[in-house]
Design a protein with these regions (language model features):
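Second RecA-like catalytic domain
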Residues: 1-241
Length: 241
């Protein structure tokens, strides 16, 4: 079956078509085997909080809306979340931005308005949060992580990635390093513990190895496994890279 083939391809089954211990763990996660494999790798690479956000995002329809009649406006609004290095990290920017708005104590109506402003589907954001919570709880029950490590705390304004703070005031210029109070100092320590690009992408590769390709020298096409060919989505931050 496709499910067994997927599991075997991600070392979830052995040559006798029996589930390995890894396969048994993958089967407990209510998501695609490829995404489940990524989630299990997150423990090894110490990036569980970040991968829980990304894995749940990859398991639902993209929360970003791109209506035909306002495509350019939507693209401009989505620039707030863009990460120039990785489309996967853009999911973290969306998640963190939404979490900060929730933490302000906004009403449901205000959150809906915020989503509309940035062309995000509020329904899909809610679906994302629900699946994230489900995956986090399952990961905790499986002993993959702890409650403290599973739930990502959004960076403070001082810790925003440069890509996420586009269009905002240059807060970094306002920071006076010599006058950091204790709260800001603790925030810097938390930021230092945040999983980095390499950790996150090493985990992602365990489930998405078939998506790795070599760019054609004469265009935007890529050659992947078994001679497959694909190209980047035009809305990707890497499309023109």
């Amino acid at each position: 079956s496709d499910g067994l083939q997927n599991s075997s391809g991600h070392i979830g089954a052995n040559t006798r078509y029996r589930l390995t211990r890894l396969g048994e763990q993958m089967a407990r996660l209510p998501i695609d085997p490829k995404i489940a494999r990524i989630l299990l790798a997150a423990k090894k690479h110490d990036c569980m909080a970040e991968i829980l956000v990304i894995a749940s995002a990859l398991s639902i329809q993209d929360p970003r809306e791109r209506p035909l009649e306002a495509r350019d406006t939507a693209a401009k609004a989505h620039e707030r979340f863009t990460d120039k290095q990785s489309d996967f990290l853009a999911y973290l920017n969306i998640w963190d931005s939404f979490q900060r708005e929730r933490d302000k104590g906004l009403s449901n109506k205000q959150l809906v308005q915020w989503c509309r402003q940035y062309f995000l589907s509020h329904l899909r954001m809610r679906e994302w949060r629900e699946l994230h919570h489900q995956l986090a709880q399952t990961a905790i029950e499986m002993g993959l992580t702890t409650k403290e490590a599973a739930f990502r705390q959004p960076p403070t304004q001082e810790q925003l990635r440069p890509s996420e703070s586009q269009g905002d005031q240059d807060l970094a210029a306002k920071l006076k390093q010599k006058q950091l109070d204790k709260k800001q100092h603790r925030a810097q320590i938390r930021a230092a513990k945040e999983a980095g690009y390499e950790q996150i992408h090493r985990a992602l590769l365990t489930g998405l190895i078939a998506n790795v390709g070599m760019k054609s020298p004469d265009g935007n096409d890529y050659t992947g496994a078994r001679g497959s060919r694909f190209h980047l989505f035009p809305a990707s931050a890497l499309f023109k890279a």
